[in-house]
């Protein structure tokens, strides 16, 4: 699984870096030629894209290193750090756009040949949609937080390029402040995306539990297993591609230790079959030592 995960995540990061680099060169020319503040916004965003995608590429390779004596749970948290770094990069670009947009609202500057800007923006829009489609597929296969953060960023780029097209079209017909107004709106949306991305990264670093749906699946697997009378103290978290799952099984007092161990192994394999690559720890408790009021997920 780790090899497939690493290959897909690395390809997604390389594709994002290559596309952002190519679009940056095109946008530099378009901004120089037209003077559009909206295209300047897209140019700054491409710079952030490159920095973020390169960070992802380096961090993902580090996060895939096996556990060692100093990092016994692996290096998966590096992905969350990459997502947090991305949110900082994006926030900085959003603040830059605010200042530039306000300046152009106060003193609007007519553009030279908006048609060139429109052509460049259409190319950027098509390329970004293709990249986001590929990233969404990688996220569905790997659940990589770093690629998900990158995907959210490029999804905002799709909306941004659409807004730029409208702004350039309005400017073509003489409404020069439209360029700055749309750039300001883009900056607000980019800042919102950055804050949301940073929040998710911090939650992962704080070991937030797995989603409710996944925890419910674990509970259903455990409590429906023959020989298991109930369960409690389910604890979950995720680090990179690895889910960490801990749970206590409640079993009949007279069940032999060997049989209890066998049942726990079966439950562990069932969980691993549903969530491959997970780190599962199961503890067996006799029913009599678990206070009834302290039980959770008890079978009725």
From Swiss-Prot:
This is Cation-efflux pump FieF. Its main location: membrane. Homodimer. Disulfide bonds: none annotated. It catalyses: Zn(2+)(in) + H(+)(out) = Zn(2+)(out) + H(+)(in); Cd(2+)(in) + H(+)(out) = Cd(2+)(out) + H(+)(in); Fe(2+)(in) + H(+)(out) = Fe(2+)(out) + H(+)(in). It is found in: Cell inner membrane. It holds the Pfam family ZT_dimer. InterPro entries: Cation_efflux, Cation_efflux_CTD, Cation_efflux_CTD_sf, Cation_efflux_FieF, Cation_efflux_TMD_sf, CDF_Transporter. It comes from Salmonella choleraesuis (strain SC-B67). Keywords: Cell inner membrane, Cell membrane, Ion transport, Iron, Iron transport, Membrane, Metal-binding, Transmembrane, Transmembrane helix, Transport, Zinc, Zinc transport. One of its GO terms (biological process) is intracellular zinc ion homeostasis.
């Amino acid at each position: 699984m780790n090899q497939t995960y690493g290959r897909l995540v690395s390809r997604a990061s390389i594709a994002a870096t290559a596309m952002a680099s190519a679009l940056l060169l095109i946008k530099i020319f378009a901004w120089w030629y037209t003077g559009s503040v909206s295209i300047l916004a897209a140019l700054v965003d491409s710079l952030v894209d490159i920095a973020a995608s390169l960070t992802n590429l380096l961090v993902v390779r580090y996060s895939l290193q096996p556990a060692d004596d100093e990092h016994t749970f692996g290096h998966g948290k590096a992905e969350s750090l990459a997502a947090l770094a991305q949110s900082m990069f994006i926030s900085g670009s959003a603040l830059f756009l605010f200042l530039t947009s306000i300046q152009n609202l106060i003193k609007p500057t007519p553009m030279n040949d908006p048609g060139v800007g429109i052509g460049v923006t259409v190319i950027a829009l098509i390329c970004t949609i293709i990249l986001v489609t590929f990233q969404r597929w990688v996220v569905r296969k790997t659940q990589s937080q770093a690629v998900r953060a990158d995907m959210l960023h490029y999804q905002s780029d799709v909306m941004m390029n659409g807004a730029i097209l409208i702004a350039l079209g309005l400017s073509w017909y003489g409404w020069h402040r439209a360029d700055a107004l749309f750039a300001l709106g883009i900056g607000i949306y980019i800042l919102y995306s950055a804050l949301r991305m940073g929040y998710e990264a911090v939650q992962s670093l704080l070991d937030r539990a797995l989603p409710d749906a996944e925890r419910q699946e674990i509970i259903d697997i455990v409590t429906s297993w023959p020989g298991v009378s109930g369960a409690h103290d389910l604890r979950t978290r995720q680090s990179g591609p690895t889910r960490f799952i801990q749970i206590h099984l409640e079993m009949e007092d007279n069940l032999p230790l060997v049989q209890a161990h066998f049942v726990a192994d079966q439950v562990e394999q069932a969980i691993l079959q549903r969530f491959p690559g997970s780190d599962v720890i199961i503890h067996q408790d006799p029913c009599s030592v678990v206070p009834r009021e302290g039980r959770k997920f008890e079978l009725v």
